[in-house]
């Protein structure tokens, strides 16, 4: 009995088999991604697809400075408000920046017809030529062109008027009928602006135009309108009870525009030959101008990013990422990051891909850890790692390329009377934005799930590759590890890793060692059977002796009567 127990203990203590484990890389990364099934999965490597930073400045777009309107708005700039004089020399720009609460617009109160449409037209203009459509000194010889000034458009403390319009008044006690035409020979669209004055009383009408009833007619191929002044008392705005309504039209190349009036005409002085630039736009921003360059400008600031998505602002100008409402869009490129505690088991095995990854393997994503008499070490499987890197890199680049449709997205213009239309447009835009956000998030979730499954599959394939080579020359001991039935030196280990393991060479040694181990198992089973029988017999004898002693004691003190019948 003692000899058999000694054999078992010696067999267990002498076992120090060579092992090889399959596992994957782990590191100290704290990157987390979401998948379809899980949230906040820690991974070894990932790429961010969502830009959330900007510089807070207005920058040059592709080397061209923007037109910063400062204290002026579009109306003040294009009409020629004298307080916007510094802007008149600007001929080209990358985009137009307007502040939310600009002070200088229409200095003389009145209605600006189709103002939102004009803004929309100017948002696609990148430069223009400002020219005299009707020169001031020689176009109106029978009308006064200097007395049409007002305190509401004062400049440097003096009454003045718009720099692109002329207020024609009576001259020498009369206001003759006028007729003036312009033929567009600029070979591009020309923006023409004019106004109609509406006095507050008949006395002003007679004083300025020398007649009670007047009209203004403007005609071109695409425009035909006749205006009649509306004389009425009105509340004073900027000290004025009168009003000027402002109008505009786009004159096509070769077209003619004709002005006829017998009073109340605010005549064009300067017009604009427009050059369209579809990368331009108008943004409303409080950001300050800086000496910087960008490819994408938002009202919040410039974005310099090649990422496909951004969550900074929906209004963008230039080559910009698509705006989404997401707060996180991170795509996994590496593996699940679950570093294992590398503790030695009974046979010195390192925890494999089941418990977690290896921080000791730094030169690849998947690989091996071996242990034999010559030592132990990690080695990456370069082929499977490189194939995985190539596949995932191509996938990430493809996703970015497909989703990275960079473009300008400017806000639409609506006047105060079009509130219902603006609300409807906002709902439509919100719907499209929700769809874009959903599509972007779903794409990332699905691709993350596929990538992690792809890595799991690669580790499993590597495991099956080793298993198919070793066959019954080794046994699976869990944790992604195999224990050899034969001695496997470094050359042998290398052959397993590169797929050239010689199974027949080691099969005889493995067979003998398997039989020895199986014999030890049989011997140990015999020992366990003897111990079980001995334990059963001994327990039965103890039980019988105990029952006999109790019975004798009870009979001796009368507690139990014993009768023997013959």
Curated annotation (Swiss-Prot):
<keyword id="KW-1164">Virus endocytosis by host</keyword>
<feature type="glycosylation site" description="N-linked (GlcNAc...) asparagine; by host">
    <location>
        <position position="40"/>
    </location>
</feature>
<keyword id="KW-0812">Transmembrane</keyword>
<feature type="disulfide bond" description="Interchain (between HA1 and HA2 chains)">
    <location>
        <begin position="21"/>
        <end position="481"/>
    </location>
</feature>
<feature type="transmembrane region" description="Helical">
    <location>
        <begin position="530"/>
        <end position="550"/>
    </location>
</feature>
<feature type="topological domain" description="Cytoplasmic">
    <location>
        <begin position="551"/>
        <end position="566"/>
    </location>
</feature>
<dbReference type="GO" id="GO:0055036">
    <property type="term" value="C:virion membrane"/>
</dbReference>
<dbReference type="GO" id="GO:0075512">
    <property type="term" value="P:clathrin-dependent endocytosis of virus by host cell"/>
</dbReference>
<feature type="glycosylation site" description="N-linked (GlcNAc...) asparagine; by host">
    <location>
        <position position="498"/>
    </location>
</feature>
<keyword id="KW-0564">Palmitate</keyword>
<dbReference type="GO" id="GO:0046761">
    <property type="term" value="P:viral budding from plasma membrane"/>
</dbReference>
<dbReference type="GO" id="GO:0020002">
    <property type="term" value="C:host cell plasma membrane"/>
</dbReference>
<feature type="glycosylation site" description="N-linked (GlcNAc...) asparagine; by host">
    <location>
        <position position="144"/>
    </location>
</feature>
<feature type="disulfide bond">
    <location>
        <begin position="59"/>
        <end position="292"/>
    </location>
</feature>
<keyword id="KW-1162">Viral penetration into host cytoplasm</keyword>
<dbReference type="GO" id="GO:0039654">
    <property type="term" value="P:fusion of virus membrane with host endosome membrane"/>
</dbReference>
<feature type="disulfide bond">
    <location>
        <begin position="488"/>
        <end position="492"/>
    </location>
</feature>
<feature type="glycosylation site" description="N-linked (GlcNAc...) asparagine; by host">
    <location>
        <position position="172"/>
    </location>
</feature>
<feature type="disulfide bond">
    <location>
        <begin position="107"/>
        <end position="153"/>
    </location>
</feature>
<comment type="subunit">
    <text>Homotrimer of disulfide-linked HA1-HA2. Interacts with human CACNA1C.</text>
</comment>
<keyword id="KW-1043">Host membrane</keyword>
<feature type="glycosylation site" description="N-linked (GlcNAc...) asparagine; by host">
    <location>
        <position position="286"/>
    </location>
</feature>
<dbReference type="InterPro" id="IPR008980">
    <property type="entry name" value="Capsid_hemagglutn"/>
</dbReference>
<dbReference type="InterPro" id="IPR013828">
    <property type="entry name" value="Hemagglutn_HA1_a/b_dom_sf"/>
</dbReference>
<keyword id="KW-1167">Clathrin- and caveolin-independent endocytosis of virus by host</keyword>
<dbReference type="GO" id="GO:0046789">
    <property type="term" value="F:host cell surface receptor binding"/>
</dbReference>
<keyword id="KW-0348">Hemagglutinin</keyword>
<keyword id="KW-0946">Virion</keyword>
<feature type="disulfide bond">
    <location>
        <begin position="296"/>
        <end position="320"/>
    </location>
</feature>
<keyword id="KW-1168">Fusion of virus membrane with host membrane</keyword>
<keyword id="KW-1161">Viral attachment to host cell</keyword>
<feature type="glycosylation site" description="N-linked (GlcNAc...) asparagine; by host">
    <location>
        <position position="177"/>
    </location>
</feature>
<protein>
    <recommendedName>
        <fullName>Hemagglutinin</fullName>
    </recommendedName>
</protein>
<keyword id="KW-1160">Virus entry into host cell</keyword>
<keyword id="KW-0732">Signal</keyword>
<keyword id="KW-1170">Fusion of virus membrane with host endosomal membrane</keyword>
<feature type="glycosylation site" description="N-linked (GlcNAc...) asparagine; by host">
    <location>
        <position position="104"/>
    </location>
</feature>
<feature type="lipid moiety-binding region" description="S-palmitoyl cysteine; by host">
    <location>
        <position position="565"/>
    </location>
</feature>
<comment type="function">
    <text>Binds to sialic acid-containing receptors on the cell surface, bringing about the attachment of the virus particle to the cell. This attachment induces virion internalization either through clathrin-dependent endocytosis or through clathrin- and caveolin-independent pathway. Plays a major role in the determination of host range restriction and virulence. Class I viral fusion protein. Responsible for penetration of the virus into the cell cytoplasm by mediating the fusion of the membrane of the endocytosed virus particle with the endosomal membrane.</text>
</comment>
<feature type="topological domain" description="Extracellular">
    <location>
        <begin position="18"/>
        <end position="529"/>
    </location>
</feature>
<feature type="lipid moiety-binding region" description="S-palmitoyl cysteine; by host">
    <location>
        <position position="555"/>
    </location>
</feature>
<keyword id="KW-1165">Clathrin-mediated endocytosis of virus by host</keyword>
